[in-house]
Amino acid sequence: MSILSTGAEAAAPTPEARVQAFIADFYKLHAASASIRKDMDFDKWHAAITRLESAHFVAGARSGLDGVMAGNPDHAPGAENIIRNVSQGQDVLIETSLADGSLHHYFEYELRKVGGDWRIASLRTYLDPIDKPFMTEAERARFEHPRLVPLRALPKREAALDGTAMFVNGRLAQVGGESSAIEVRRVGTLKVNTGILVAGDLGYDSKLLAPLGQRIAPGQYPVEVSIAFKRVAALRMKISDRPVVRWHPADMSERNHVVGVDAADVFISDISALLPVTIRHKEKEFEKFANAGDLTSAIMLNLAGPDDAVVATSGYGDGAYPVYWGVDADGKPAVLLVDMLVLTELSDDE
């Protein structure tokens, strides 16, 4: 029977047998659907992948392969080899490696026994060995000993910033002739162990993260988001209850106060949350956020421990987003704010 047809798949007596059967069937599907992929017929490709998943995955689980049509097959018998098998309670994790020219791809299959059959519960793809530290040795140095950066005045075009007004629940915001009521949502409480905060995009590697140039006292701080125009408009961490009297750019140790975003997220944590984390654990935590699939998503993550990081959807997606310190009358940080550039009436002087 063609892999493009619907049919009953034989039960797999072992986790390894299921993985090997899936690899072989995907490879056959990839070859048999060359014309579908050439024509970029997404509907037919999606239908074929759905049938493949039905044959090998637990009910409702997805492979993520329906979005991958071009290039060499992601899985190929003989080229993709099992490198580790780990029991995890009732489930089994199988890790594989596939060489594609000069590149290596690593896969993690989570398998679950359903009756007498082993099925794939999840499939994750990595570009580096799965247990490799998220932060390289070279990267660790700039995070462990970051440079302190004095506070400076806001740039002229940002002088109109009103970060406090961004968090007035029910306030009617006006942008471009449209209006939206602001909704303030509590995300959680961020645990800060060292007082060295990191901001950026968690979706890729640590190069998109940077330590901030100011320090705060270790402690636990409430985190909120402002929702407007059906998206996250701002993210803030309240360091104290004292009123903010001035705003300053939250410059980073080796760059300005703007975080570059390529995965549509803004992330904040203490440095202690990142140093011990492996690529596998970082990806699993970030997956919780990615699976929400909501323009208003903001959740706490558990990297090195409970609630030691926060991640939120970044305004209108990829781009560059400014970070600010709100200081009290004594010049001490009272708020850390990320402006998602949605409420431009409150952030842009032009």
Region spans (language model):
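Short aromatic-glycine motifs in intrinsically disordered, low-complexity regions
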Residues: G67-A70, Y109-V114, A312-G315
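Core segments of small alpha/beta cavity-forming domains
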Residues: G7, A11-V68
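Low-complexity, intrinsically disordered terminal/linker segments enriched in charged
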Residues: P15-V19, I23, Y27, V86-D91, ...
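Short, surface-exposed coil-to-beta transition loops
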Residues: S102-E108, D318-V323
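N-terminal domain-onset segments
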Residues: L4, A12-E16, Q20, E137-E350
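Surface-exposed, charged secondary-structure patches
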Residues: A47-H105
